[in-house]
Swiss-Prot record:
InterPro entries hit by this protein: Glyco_trans_19
Membrane-spanning residues: none
The name this protein goes by in its record: Lipid-A-disaccharide synthase
Entry keyword Nucleotidyltransferase: no
Role, per record: Condensation of UDP-2,3-diacylglucosamine and 2,3-diacylglucosamine-1-phosphate to form lipid A disaccharide, a precursor of lipid A, a phosphorylated glycolipid that anchors the lipopolysaccharide to the outer membrane of the cell.
Pathway as given in its UniProt record: Bacterial outer membrane biogenesis; LPS lipid A biosynthesis
Amino acid sequence: MPDEASANPSRKIFLIATEESGDRLGSSLMKALRRRLGCSVRFEGVGGQTMAREGLVSLFPIEELSIMGFTAVVKQLPMIVRRIRGTADAVIAAAPDVLVIIDSPDFTHRVARRVRARCRGLPIVDYVSPSVWAWRSGRARAMRSYVDHVLALLPFEPEAYRRLGGPPCTYVGHPLLEQIGVLRPDAQERQRRDADPPTLLVLPGSRRSEIRHHLSVFGETIGMLQQSIPEIEVVLPTTPHLVDEITPAVATWPRRPRVVIGEDDKRAAFRVARAALAKSGTVTLELALAGVPMVAAYKAGSVEAWIARRVIRVSSVILANLVIRENVIPEFLQEDCVPGKLAPALQEILTDSPMRRRQLKAFDGLNTIMATGQRSPSELAADIVIEAMRESRARM
């Protein structure tokens, strides 16, 4: 591999990540780029704590944008618009070699459009595809005017972009692939997974709005489940910024869960859990890679639910189902997200039932479906970012 550090003595990369998941992606990408380009590479932009540990000084705290739901967004709209304009101005002022936008398309794509209008020669790479394959498919074609390359986390996304007339799209792999070793149990942990009483993971979401929508329903579900499995152990992984809200809320549950904080404790819980009750989202893919059968649920505000029903065009909202291309994970959405339906489904996957066996068989093939060869997702992503800079300089 050529020594980019000596061939390219100075590079400035502007990254924008406004959610925790994007912050983690950005941090891994920064590490991979620094390995390739050396210490001369400089980073500017927007990010969270993990990107800060890699040296990024964020334009503003990303917690400002951790809002979800139509009504909440409307209330914060003036602040959001101000941040979009300010971030675009900062990109132009920085004059970077490349702009990398990471997830959060409602924010990052608006910034990218503003930047492209004012600086047409700046390459723009989108790390994490918007869900154009699920809803608002016209976005794919529209992205051609302001995104030069999409880095996909899901293996079916490049084909979707070709079909929809979008920009070039390359599957680089999901960051969860780098965690398989710490997600899957060793022999002793597998024995604990199969032992009684069973351990159930409860994952109500990572945003405050999600917690509010799911926590009480999940608590009632555990109460119903405890009637048939009295000694069930319940573990609820969460993050430091949510623990103060979650801890008092679960104190009144019929079966009080053990709340664990941080990635290490979360992964340890994954390795011994027999099953999980999870809010629909990336965590379903994480559970599938860990080999944990699950029931998925999602409840949104009435306005968001009304909109979603009219625009979503996929057979399942569960990421793991979409990657596997088979609806093996039961999903209970909106009015179906009730204890009377969740508890029986959980009881079924906690036992050696056909549903549990079907999920485990499907999960066994997930590695092959998502494989990226010998290189990590962040390394593959760094390749494309570097190539975008190289092509841009060649045109100058």
